[in-house]
Structures are given as C-alpha cells and as structure tokens.
Amino acid sequence: DRTSRGLGDVYKRQLKNSVKVTFNENGTDVEEEFDKLIVAVGRKPNSSNIIDESLNIAIEEGFIKVDEHCQTSVKNIWAIGDVVRGPMLAHKGSEEGIMVAERIADKHAEVNYDLVPSVIYSHPEIAWVGKNETELKDKKISYKVGKFPFAASGRALAVDQSVGFVKVLSDSKTDTILGVHVFGPAAAEIVQQALISMEFGASAEDIALTMFSHPTVSEAFHEAALAANNQAIHIGNKTR
C-alpha cells in the first residue's frame, strides 16, 4: 500500500520511455521508475462569480447546496451539474437538467444517484456502477462475488484484448445485483448493460438466465453473474 505518499520530483526518461518519480516514504525519499505516471488531481466547482450574493443561495465548500431534486435554498432557483454535489460527470449533469426541466413543468422526475455509471477511458477501460466491496463491508451488507476474467473470453482472445475481468456483487440473501465493476475491453458498454439490469432490480440469476450472443465480450458479464452463484461455465467455480 503506497497511498498518501508525498510526491517529489518527476523526470521523464526519453531513452527508456519511462518516468522516474521521487516520493516520501516513512520520512525517507524513495526514487522509483515507472512506465507511466497518471496525474489525477481532482477538480473544484466553478461556482464563483455566477451567483448574485444578494440572493443568499447556500454554498457548501464551493458547491451550490441543493436537495435531491436540485432545488437550491432559494425557491424557484435550481442548480445542476458540476456546481452541485455528486460526481462531476456529463451524463449525471444532463440527467439532472432533464429532471429539473420536468419538475419546473410540474411533472414527476427523479435521478437515481445510486446508479450513476463511471468510466475511466484508459486502455484497457475501467468502468463501474453501484456499490464496491468496501462500501458493502462498511454498511455490513452480506454479499456474493462473481468474477470472470477476459482471459477466458473467446472474443477478447480473438481481438487480443484479454487483460482484465468483470466482477458482479450481489446480495447474499436476495441475489439482487448491488454493483458491477469492469476492467478490460468495452468496459463502458458492459457496465451500461449492468446499469439497465440494476435499474429494473435484476438479480445475478436474472442475468445468468439471459441468452448472450457468442462470441461477444459482454458474455463476460453473463459469466460473472453465473459465477456469483457458483454456476460459471467457462471457469472453475468456488468450492462450496
């Protein structure tokens, strides 16, 4: 575990096509070489100079404070997207905009903030939706894990993109899917399938009983759902 380390100097080594990084570990400067350095410093809400202070709209740590329907502390003033709480994602902001427009028109609309998909457009891609294992453990929710590697996927092997896996987390009692995490080819598309399933309250068994085209990388989602109940076909299952 090398989290929370103070970063020092960073050098790009042209001849080796690598990056040399200095960081502090237990009070000592350590220098190591890596293939790549990903800079992920986060973002801040750009809420300054867009609100008339005389309106007295509540601001919390730079974010415009809103309720679950994006209503601010002032009646008839709404805020959406990156200036309000939650992940700074275009699709989340877009859905909030639709919800607000619907509610202004006196129609009922909601955003399910428990099912906001996230994607890292790296290579391989990383995508997830729902809960992760740490969150489930913190909430003391008993869950099952189904995991399927792309190394066992015929389509992934055929296109030479077999690195990664699909992980399905489902409730131990109800089998309801609680989270899906994908690292590998077409991760963003696979997670979208998972998101639709979760919106309708699908169980791992529901996905297991669904026919998937072969060969496709999305079969990995099918196999991971099967694996959640020790019924995987193309990999070994856990000993009961």
Language-model segments: which ranges?
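A short, glycine/Asx- and small/polar-enriched loop/turn
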Residues: 14-19, 74, 159-164
